C-alpha cells in the first residue's frame, strides 16, 4: 500500500498508464500457459469489442496448429448452407472475422451480422476458439461455457448513465466460467 501510495501520484501526474492491450495479452499468455482457455472477455460496448479484438497481436493457438485452416474450412461449410452464401463471402466483415478467427479470437455482439454471429457460435461450441470478446448479450440465452471469464470493467452504460454491473448480472455472466462436466472450477478475472 505504501509503495503504491508513493507511485500513484507520479503515474497520474505524468499521465502514464498501462495500455489495455498489454494487460489483456499478458493475461491471455498466462491463461494459455496454465491451460485456462477458452476465455470469455466481457466488454460493455460493441465498438470496444471490435477494437480490443483487433488489437490483440498474439496468436492463441500452438505454433504449428492446423486449427486456423480448419476454422476457415468449417466457416465456409457453415455459410455455404445460407441462401446468400456468395454475397456473404465477399463482405469485408467476413475477412475481418476470419483474420481474428485464425488467431483463435471471436467477437460476438448485436452489431455482427446474424449469419456470422451464428457461424461463430457453432465454431465456438466445436471448441475452435480460445477467446470470445463479447458484450453482455453473451451472458444470456447462448450456451457457450468457458474456463475463464474476464471483465474489462464492471462499469457499464445502461442507456442513461454509467453504473456498476448488478449482482444478478454478474452472477449470470460469471457463471459461464467452468464447463459443466469438464472443469472442477471456473475463473473470473
Where are these regions (language model features)?
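Conserved C-terminal RecA-like helicase domain
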Residues: 2-9, 25-28, 42, 46-131, ...
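Residue-level preference for the first positions of well-ordered beta-strands
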Residues: 38-40, 131, 187
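Conserved nucleotide-binding/hydrolysis micro-motifs of P-loop NTPases
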Residues: 46-49, 112-113, 138-140, 155-157, ...
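H-loop/switch region of ABC-family ATPase nucleotide-binding domains
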Residues: 135
Amino acid at each position: 500500500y505504501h509503495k503504491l501510495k508513493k507511485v500513484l501520484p507520479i503515474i497520474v501526474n505524468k499521465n502514464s498508464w498501462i495500455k489495455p492491450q498489454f494487460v489483456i495479452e499478458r493475461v491471455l499468455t498466462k491463461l494459455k500457459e496454465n491451460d485456462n482457455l477458452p476465455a470469455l472477455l466481457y466488454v460493455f460496448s460493441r465498438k470496444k469489442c471490435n477494437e480490443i479484438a483487433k488489437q490483440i497481436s498474439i496468436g492463441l493457438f500452438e505454433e504449428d496448429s492446423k486449427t486456423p485452416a480448419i476454422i476457415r474450412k468449417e466457416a465456409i461449410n457453415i455459410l455455404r448452407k445460407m441462401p446468400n452464401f456468395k454475397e456473404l463471402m465477399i463482405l469485408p466483415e467476413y475477412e475481418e472475422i476470419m483474420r481474428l478467427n485464425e488467431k483463435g479470437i471471436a467477437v460476438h455482439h448485436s452489431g455482427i451480422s446474424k449469419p456470422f454471429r451464428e457461424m461463430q457460435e457453432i465454431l465456438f461450441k466445436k471448441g475452435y476458439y480460445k477467446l470470445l470478446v463479447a458484450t453482455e448479450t453473451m451472458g444470456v440465452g447462448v450456451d457457450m461455457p468457458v474456463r475463464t471469464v474476464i471483465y474489462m470493467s464492471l462499469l457499464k452504460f445502461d442507456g442513461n448513465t454509467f453504473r456498476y454491473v448488478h449482482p444478478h448480472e454478474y452472477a449470470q455472466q460469471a457463471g459461464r466460467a467452468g464447463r459443466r462436466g469438464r472443469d472442477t472450477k471456473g475463473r473470473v478475472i
